[in-house]
Design a protein with these regions (language model features):
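N-terminal secretory signal peptides
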Residues: 1-18, 22-33, 38
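Kelch-like beta-propeller repeat domains
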Residues: 42-381
């Protein structure tokens, strides 16, 4: 594939995939070598991979463990983590028992504050939480505590230091209580949740909550052949490229690990490209990079055990890319959560379980400035 002079001078006009293919074919007139951030997908370093195009080109993802001073949140898993850009809000989860505490992490100060107050949601885990930018509040939905499942909605207002329970009408339609649903905030500032389960079984329905008037709407698409089966224990992110919910993997009856990627838009469900893709898994963390328009999946539990790999899903070209990290990294884990900090283009990851114990460490993942960067100048003949 040959590029014109305009494309050669301005490679950002090309998709990352087409530029990589052209570079590998030797058909570019670029004065620099561009490499796509990817690897063999095992989450670890691959010796010599930088010399093998297509099997682990050079990567610039960096992990760094943060070391805030005490006090620190107790170890936990199945919690929520959201951010307003300056602070990160950690709520709930479970260790030996469900937790109902609220902790606030200052990004600038690298410090935790226990913000637990009376009058908030009861202890729970496996709930959904999002940050409502329009109203500067954290919205919490559902979850589980022991044998109890919830479908209540709560909002935390940091400016007031208070919790508010949404007054959803008892006669109005609303989702059944559930745990482990996919959830994200859409472009209009509404909470979208899909699937999940209770002790009565798993769900395949989808709902949209409008915080402005505290109302739910059932947005489950009409029955079609193309739709995800009932499932739970997965995450959701909102793709701003096509205005849709992205949901990967999870667990269903008799199949503890799924590896399919689905998108829910106003037109219904669509299954997205599958190969290459992350191993089948549940209880992973996933965020959305709103600058580069991609979902970033981190770790989780697979048939082989806990993982600490990182995968990217390009929302524009719709393909997965495995990444590798050349620095120390978190132990493999599941039940952790992550928050995308747009202001610094970084990801913060907290807690989870490594298969032996619950954790309370916090890590920062820094993506490369660009997936395609000049590595070294190439002499022009």
């Amino acid at each position: 594939m040959n590029m014109g002079m305009s494309d050669a001078l301005f490679p950002h006009r090309l998709s990352r995939r087409s530029l990589l293919r052209s570079a590998l074919a030797g058909g570019t007139g670029l004065a620099a070598t561009y490499l796509l951030a990817c690897s063999d997908g095992d989450g670890g370093s691959t010796p010599g991979a930088t010399d093998q195009p297509g099997d682990g080109e050079q990567v610039r993802f960096r992990w760094a463990q943060l070391a805030p001073a005490a006090p620190l949140p107790p170890a936990r898993r199945d919690h929520s983590l959201v951010t307003d850009g300056a602070s990160v809000y950690l709520f709930g989860g479970q260790a030996n028992e469900p937790r109902g505490d609220l902790w606030v992490y200052s990004i600038a100060d690298n410090a935790w504050t226990n913000a637990t107050i009376e009058g908030g949601p009861g202890a729970r885990f496996g709930h959904n939480a999002v940050w409502d930018t329009n109203r500067s509040r954290m919205i919490v939905f559902g979850g589980q505590a022991s044998n109890a499942f919830f479908n209540d909605v709560w909002e935390y207002a940091p400016a007031e230091g208070r919790w508010f329970q949404a007054k959803v009408g008892t006669e109005a339609p609303s989702p059944a209580p559930r745990y482990g649903a996919a959830g994200a905030i859409d472009s209009a500032g509404a909470l979208v949740v899909s699937h999940g389960f209770t002790d009565q079984g798993r769900f395949s329905d989808s709902w949209r909550y409008d915080p402005a008037n505290a109302t739910w709407a059932d947005i489950t698409p009409a029955d079609t052949e193309e739709k995800p089966i009932e499932r739970c224990l997965m995450r959701g992110v909102w793709d701003t490229v096509r205005d849709r919910l992205l949901m990967y993997g999870g667990q269903t009856t008799d199949t503890p690990f799924l590896d399919d990627l689905w998108a829910l838009a106003s037109t219904g469900w669509q299954q997205l490209p599958r190969s290459p893709n992350p191993d089948a898994r549940n209880l992973y963390a996933m965020v959305y990079d709103d600058r580069r328009k991609r979902a970033i999946l981190i770790g989780g539990r697979t048939p082989a055990g806990q993982m600490n790999d990182v995968w990217l899903f390009d929302a524009t070209d719709e393909f997965w890319t495995p990444t590798t990290v050349r620095t120390s990294r978190p132990t493999p884990r599941y039940g952790h959560d992550a928050a995308w900090v747009s202001e610094t283009s970084t990801i913060l990851v907290f807690g989870g379980n490594d298969g032996l114990e619950d954790l309370n460490d916090i890590w920062q993942l820094t993506p490369p400035a660009s997936d395609l960067e000049p590595i070294a100048p190439t002499p022009t003949p």
